Amino acid sequence: MNKQQLKAYFMLMRLHRPIPILLILWPTLTALVLASHGLPDISYLVIFTIGVVVMRTVGCIINDIADVDFDKHVARTNTRPLTSGQLSIKNAIWLCISLTLVAFICVLFLNLYTILLSFVALFLAILYPFCKRFFAIPQLILGLAFNFGIFMAFSAIQNQIPVEAWIFYIATICWTIAYDTIYALADREFDLETGIKSSAVLFGNKVFRYILLFNFLSLLLLIILGIYCDFNSFFYLGVVICSLFFVRNYFLYKKLGITNCINAFSANHWIGLIIFIIAVIQYI
């Protein structure tokens, strides 16, 4: 394998774009903190961090395999390894299988409940790329998939999925719908031409209102989480800071344009970091 092929595999796994990994990682780590009522054992941090990175790459590979014919016609995606012919579909499938096995080996160190949940996580990762063809809001499926690590974190530590896990899960789903709708704005014109489904297409000229609505719902659910868990004022201060980030992002993505939308999307990882920090503070 030469240097060019290694670079192609690197690009296929999206390791050059770590923001989506962080968007999955922060809620998962936060769930570990909530489930542990403090800093979790280092083994959980290692297993879940590896799992997030590996399954994110698996999702990207499945997405590229599913969308290879569409990506050829989009300027933003027509240089990807599969669409440009740098790697074959067969190469991608073998890599996907190998990485899935790595993720499964990681989860074998956890309890049976979490192992069973891992199959649901894999199903969601496979489903998302294809649901863009028939489901009006594929961002909902993405939210279910991206944040499923929350359930796995609680099941690994508590062997159950308590009420606070559900509240946090739904909050992050609303957050994901909002930020991925921003991302979808970059491709909305192409999606309209090809019939690809997305929330950016469905919401039409009211898309900005819906993004704000889902941001608001995520904040509201975080407040409910704080009340349910009897968190201190630092948690609510963090929620206020998150709301300021949402307002800042609004003025960015409202200008439209690929660069503005991608930048607004990417800035959301700071939201995840803030929530993680304020969760840790609760148990110091």
Swiss-Prot record:
Cleavable signal peptide: none
InterPro entries named among the record's database cross-references: HB_polyprenyltransferase-like, Prenyltransferase, UbiA_prenyltransferase, UbiA_prenylTrfase_CS, UbiA_sf
Compartments where found: Cell inner membrane
UniProt main location, coarse: membrane
Catalyzed reactions per annotation: all-trans-octaprenyl diphosphate + 4-hydroxybenzoate = 4-hydroxy-3-(all-trans-octaprenyl)benzoate + diphosphate
Pathway where it operates: Cofactor biosynthesis; ubiquinone biosynthesis
Cofactor(s) this protein cannot do without: Mg(2+)
Membrane topology listed for this record: Multi-pass membrane protein
Keywords: Cell inner membrane, Cell membrane, Magnesium, Membrane, Transferase, Transmembrane, Transmembrane helix, Ubiquinone biosynthesis
GO cellular component entries: plasma membrane
Protein's recorded name: 4-hydroxybenzoate octaprenyltransferase
